[in-house]
Amino acid sequence: MATTKSFLILFFMILATTSSTCAKLEEMVTVLSIDGGGIKGIIPAIILEFLEGQLQEVDNNKDARLADYFDVIGGTSTGGLLTAMITTPNENNRPFAAAKDIVPFYFEHGPHIFNYSGSIFGPRYDGKYLLQVLQEKLGETRVHQALTEVAISSFDIKTNKPVIFTKSNLAKSPELDAKMYDICYSTAAAPIYFPPHHFVTHTSNGATYEFNLVDGGVATVGDPALLSLSVATRLAQEDPAFSSIKSLDYKQMLLLSLGTGTNSEFDKTYTAEEAAKWGPLRWMLAIQQMTNAASSYMTDYYISTVFQARHSQNNYLRVQENALTGTTTEMDDASEANMELLVQVGETLLKKPVSKDSPETYEEALKRFAKLLSDRKKLRANKASY
């Protein structure tokens, strides 16, 4: 039902898009979206490190950071953590983490985050170390201080509604100006794995506002690309920097969407005969895997359809590994051996073709994206200087 509704929304977006005007490069809206997936966040971290390295090379600037080039960076679960790491400012008002720092972060802290709590009835992990390290790294920083627009999702189990943390929402909903560590823990608090997170903020009149949040994947089913595009669309309508964008047009969007890998095409498939013998617990685990795999595929399908309909397929790049096997399929296997395998998955993915119909590799496509991002940044800087 939810996927049908999403498709209809996008279908009417296409119908509403009548302008054939191509945006000037400096006025294109650039969007980065990062999926959820626990320790598998190592895979998009490898991709981000490569892209940031390319931007530094193209611009001959070792201090170039991803937040300098993207108008919107969105993520859910581990993707929300990556979003915070590359957009939260340090004391010099620069991202506190470079992309190359993310994989070492997983290696240092992953084994402690995914350390079995020993509880039979509660979540698999108590979440204490995760919250502690997020507090240490992100400090008291709040959403409004992010270096670019962010879109981090969570789900409130008390109101039964998604909660989207963005800078652009704060004027209307100041209670969303939460601390980044609270947001990061909340978006990563996957049911079964971590406890839900409770915290409070304040409304414009000073009243206490309560949150009871779980994993953002409950709201976006693991892939926040549609959410990130929605935030980018609103940004384009409200920000004077994008004055040439008169109506929704995906020719005017540049979207990079990073997955954390799936195994839907190669592993953990089932027959009707097998599934007929399952009990509730086995079905619960299988449904989670199936839902994540189906959602990732359908979101990519929807977005690809929209960009192709606007003859803008080169403006969208989905980087995803669909052949995970063995321990690399697990979101919580933080053993050193498995993390090394995930690094290899990311590095190998860069050499793979983007599609069966194109010889272009992900590495080549990311270099093309880096050049576009660099050119747009320079054009925008020149325009601002007049």
UniProtKB/Swiss-Prot annotation:
Coiled coil, from the record: 321-384
SUPFAM superfamilies, A to Z: FabD/lysophospholipase-like
Residue ranges annotated as motif GXGXXG: 36-41
General function of this protein: Probable lipolytic acyl hydrolase (LAH), an activity which is thought to be involved in the response of tubers to pathogens.
EC class: hydrolase
Cell compartments where the protein resides: Vacuole
Disulfide bridges in this chain: none
Tissue: Tuber.
Cleavable signal peptide: 1-23
Domain PNPLA: 32-229
Pfam families, per the entry: Patatin
Gene3D superfamilies: Cytosolic phospholipase A2 catalytic domain
Organism (species): Solanum tuberosum (Potato)
Placement of sequence motif DGA/G: 215-217
Source superkingdom: Eukaryota
Protein name: Patatin-15
Enzyme Commission (EC) number: 3.1.1.-
An example Gene Ontology molecular-function term: phospholipase activity
Keywords: Coiled coil, Glycoprotein, Hydrolase, Lipid degradation, Lipid metabolism, Plant defense, Signal, Storage protein, Vacuole
